[in-house]
Curated annotation (Swiss-Prot):
Keywords: Capsid protein, Helical capsid protein, Host nucleus, Host-virus interaction, Ribonucleoprotein, RNA-binding, Viral nucleoprotein, Viral penetration into host nucleus, Virion, Virus entry into host cell. InterPro entries: Flu_NP. Late in virus-infected cells, may be cleaved from a 56-kDa protein to a 53-kDa protein by a cellular caspase. This cleavage might be a marker for the onset of apoptosis in infected cells or have a specific function in virus host interaction. Its main location: virion. It is found in: Virion; Host nucleus. GO terms for biological process: symbiont entry into host cell; viral penetration into host nucleus. Belongs to the influenza viruses nucleoprotein family. One of its GO terms (molecular function) is RNA binding. This is Nucleoprotein. Disulfide bonds: none annotated. A motif (Bipartite nuclear localization signal) lies at residues 198-216. It comes from the Viruses. The gene is NP. Residues 1-21 are annotated as: Disordered.
């Protein structure tokens, strides 16, 4: 994404491949998810999980977290050098839920990381299969995006909580590579940069010496990633200024916050991929599906089709609504936390409600929660239609970037208007257009003022029937223009705490 000449498709980023043709890409992505599936089956055998227990999303998440922890070299090294009480740096584990005498029991398991790595490599033809690990990270990130709010993190870096729609991928680990960078929202990149600049302000040695040089390279790389997400010349020029600053400080923080706000209307291009829980790939492999031979894509019909035929269960707390739990996981599976609810509802075929109206907490169960009253139910992850995932941000034509709602980052390439409250957004841009970026700021504000909420994004793009795998007959939905489609409207979700 960094420069025009080297655009690789998501799948190439995902599988670390150089330019490949469509068939090769489909095969390598297929190899990646097939490896995840084989690993999951092997882990279920190791843990002696019943078929039902193996389809429990909480068990899937524990197994995914174990393999991610086993390959987290930085943290493993840190744990070995700083032994903390009661933590064995060589072991990893988590809660596994089993059905005993009509009740759900929690069992804490511990495994050697070495053993987990062996099982993972064995499932992936002896390779480290980093792409598969990144894929699991993105699934966890998408789940966090749908489940938690980042108000506190936004406020801490001096940003406005209403900018939540820019925060896709904010919980992705740093080691998530190019595929991870592609799915990070503008706000996430801005926040990472601001944290870095603040450290530099507080710690004189941050930019100095041998370490400082590495820090500087990382800073410039992050600036370039963010620059690549912007689609207007003025926004990109401002990013050049931030990157080239000799000694990044408050002026750069100001510029970055300005750019983040501008992205509410002049949308950045952020990739969306449907990353599914490991148990879903496991089920498909177990039923004899050959991912590598059939090929697979994260941005087409394949994930929809997979979910159409998979039965996944979830633990449900006493007062939770199973339909709402299903919505949460459906949104996570399709990376649709920041999508317009009108579009999501149309594709899913059932109404998708704002988070403030959900009677459900997160998917993961804390270790201090009582298992006595825990129930389980089937997650409804099927959809009525499918649509192609987008990476464009939905500006109507590339140069004159158009409207974007104050809380939408489109996931699906489907025609719609992007309603937004221009007054709300423009109010944030009070006067401050002096300084070295003044001409760019003026230009950005001018573009924002000329954006019209009634403009149509993704002109002519529609959804497809699930029988239409070649995407031949687009069905262009018509939406009620007035209805605001923000998932975070009237939000009351928990904060994300690491």
């Amino acid at each position: 994404m960094a420069s025009q000449g080297t655009k690789r498709s998501y799948e190439q980023m995902e599988t670390g491949g150089e330019r490949q043709n469509a068939t090769e890409i489909r095969a390598s992505v297929g190899r990646m998810v097939g490896g995840i599936g084989r690993f999951y089956i092997q882990m279920c055998t190791e843990l002696k999980l019943s078929d039902y227990e193996g389809r429990l999303i909480q068990n899937s998440i524990t197994i995914e977290r174990m393999v991610l922890s086993a390959f987290d070299e930085r943290r493993n090294k840190y744990l070995e050098e700083h032994p903390s009480a009661g933590k064995d740096p060589k072991k990893t584990g988590g809660p596994i839920y089993r059905r005993r005498d009509g009740k759900w029991m929690r069992e804490l398991i511990l495994y050697d990381k070495e053993e987990i790595r062996r099982i993972w490599r064995q499932a992936n033809n002896g390779e480290d299969a980093t792409a598969g690990l990144t894929h699991l990270m993105i699934w966890h990130s998408n789940l966090n995006d749908a489940t938690y709010q980042r108000t506190r993190a936004l406020v801490r870096t001096g940003m406005d909580p209403r900018m939540c729609s820019l925060m896709q991928g904010s919980t992705l680990p740093r080691r998530s590579g190019a595929a991870g960078a592609a799915v990070k929202g503008v706000g996430t990149m801005v926040m990472e940069l601001i944290r870095m600049i603040k450290r530099g302000i507080n710690d004189r040695n941050f930019w100095r010496g041998e370490n400082g040089r590495r820090t500087r390279i990382a800073y410039e790389r992050m600036c370039n990633i963010l620059k690549g997400k912007f689609q207007t010349a003025a926004q990109r020029a401002m990013m050049d200024q931030v990157r080239e600053s000799r000694n990044p400080g408050n002026a750069e923080i100001e510029d970055l916050i300005f750019l983040a706000r501008s992205a509410l209307i002049l949308r950045g291009s952020v990739a969306h991929k449907s990353c599914l829980p490991a148990c879903v790939y496991g089920l498909a492999v177990a039923s004899g599906y050959e991912f590598e031979r059939e090929g697979y894509s994260l941005v087409g019909i394949d994930p929809f089709r997979l979910l159409q035929n998979s039965q996944v269960f979830s633990l449900i707390r006493p007062k939770e609504n199973p339909a709402h739990k299903s919505q949460l996981v459906w949104m996570a599976c399709h990376s649709a936390a920041f999508e317009d609810l009108r579009v999501s509802s149309f594709i899913r075929g059932t109404r998708v409600v704002p988070r403030g109206q959900l009677s459900t907490r997160g998917v993961q169960i804390a270790s201090n929660e009582n298992m006595e009253a825990m129930d389980s139910s089937t997650l409804e992850l099927r959809s009525r239609y499918w649509a192609i995932r987008t990476r464009s941000g939905g500006n109507t034509n590339q140069q004159r970037a158009s409207a974007g709602q104050i809380s939408v980052q489109p996931t699906f390439s489907v025609q719609r208007n992007l309603p937004f409250e221009r007054a709300t957004i423009m109010a944030a841009f009070t006067g401050n257009t002096e300084g070295r970026t003044s001409d760019m700021r003026t230009e950005i504000i001018r573009m924002m003022e000329s954006a019209r909420p009634e403009d149509v994004s993704f002109q002519g793009r529609g959804v497809f029937e699930l029988s239409d795998e070649k995407a031949t007959n687009p069905i262009v939905p018509s939406f009620d223009m007035s209805n605001e489609g923000s998932y975070f409207f009237g939000d009351n979700a928990e904060e994300y705490d690491n």
